[in-house]
UniProtKB/Swiss-Prot annotation:
It comes from Shewanella pealeana (strain ATCC 700345 / ANG-SQ1). Belongs to the pyruvate, phosphate/water dikinase regulatory protein family. PSRP subfamily. The keyword Protein transport does not apply. Signal peptide: none annotated. The keyword Kinase applies. Its EC number is 2.7.11.33, 2.7.4.28. ADP binds at G150, V151, S152, R153, C154, G155, K156, T157. This is Putative phosphoenolpyruvate synthase regulatory protein. InterPro entries: Kinase-pyrophosphorylase, PSRP. Keywords: Kinase, Nucleotide-binding, Serine/threonine-protein kinase, Transferase. It catalyses: [pyruvate, water dikinase] + ADP = [pyruvate, water dikinase]-phosphate + AMP + H(+); [pyruvate, water dikinase]-phosphate + phosphate + H(+) = [pyruvate, water dikinase] + diphosphate.
Length: 270
């Protein structure tokens, strides 16, 4: 039976989830997780406490409880459960009070207030990424914060969407296709925005696996074609001095982080 994990908050529970996932990912185990947001009343807290206690009685193991609860009276109810408590907010508050010389003034949902302020920017960035995906149009490249380049199936679209959704970055992407290989060069719209260009590449063998799973027994998915495309595109990156990263065996989160690190782009939101 998988160890039970609770992510609890009097807000969205995003903070508890992020920290909890980061900690638990250090262990080669699987967990049965339940997220419970908006535990804003003592009645709700008592109901959650009952869930935790029932889980302990059923499994004989104390559930792991990751929480970020601002209200002390609600937090105390969760503390009194049979769960093993990991309280992220208050673990850091007391030491910081000493360092800053200021008493904390907790405010519910303050941690996500910036999300409300930047909601429109996030939506604009997502819409931009979708409208400028895979070279659908070259008309709005001047408005991009970032333009990703690469062969088909190297990770351009998921990276663009992740950057827009997570950080509010307007990320366009442009594909280099088989037809481009004989005379590979940057289109004029990309030349005008060369300072925004960032390349993605991938190991040919991995590219072959990805394409083969979608279009087997085609020239497009052949290992030879994958090798040709990757080689030509990497040569273009070097010729044009375009920074690039290899996406092989990296998650979209890791790819996005590498892009931000290399480009110095500012995260528009957290």
């Amino acid at each position: 039976m998988l160890r039970k994990v609770f992510y609890i908050s009097d807000g969205t529970a995003i903070t508890a989830e992020v920290f909890g996932h980061a900690v638990l990912s250090q262990f080669p185990l699987e967990f049965d997780a339940l997220t419970i947001p908006f535990v804003e009343t003592q009645e709700k807290a008592e109901a959650v406490k009952a869930q935790i206690n029932d889980c302990f009685i059923t499994t004989g193991e104390r559930p792991l409880v990751f929480h970020s609860i601002v209200k002390a009276e609600i937090r105390d109810i969760i503390y009194s459960s049979e769960g093993l408590d990991y309280d992220f907010l208050n673990t850091f508050v007391a030491p910081l009070e000493k360092q800053l010389g200021v008493a904390a003034a907790p405010a519910l949902h303050r941690t996500h207030g910036k999300a409300n302020e930047s909601y429109e920017a996030r939506i604009d960035a997502i819409n931009y990424a979708m409208e400028n995906d895979d070279g659908q149009t070259m008309k709005h490249m001047d408005k991009a914060d970032l333009i990703l380049l690469g062969v088909s199936r190297c990770g351009k679209t998921p990276s663009s969407l992740y950057l827009s959704m997570q950080f509010g970055i307007k990320a366009a992407n442009y594909p280099f296709t088989e037809d481009d290989m004989d005379n590979l060069k940057l289109p004029e719209a990309l030349k005008r925005n060369k300072h925004k260009l960032f390349g993605l590449t991938i190991d040919p063998e991995r590219l072959h696996e990805i394409r083969h799973s979608r279009m087997s027994n085609s020239r497009y998915s052949s290992l030879r074609q994958c090798r040709v495309e990757v080689k030509e595109v990497e040569m273009l990156y070097k010729k044009e001095r375009i920074p690039y990263v290899n996406t092989t065996n990296h998650s979209v989160e890791e790819i996005a982080t590498k892009i931000l690190e290399e480009t110095g782009l500012k995260r528009h939101m957290f």
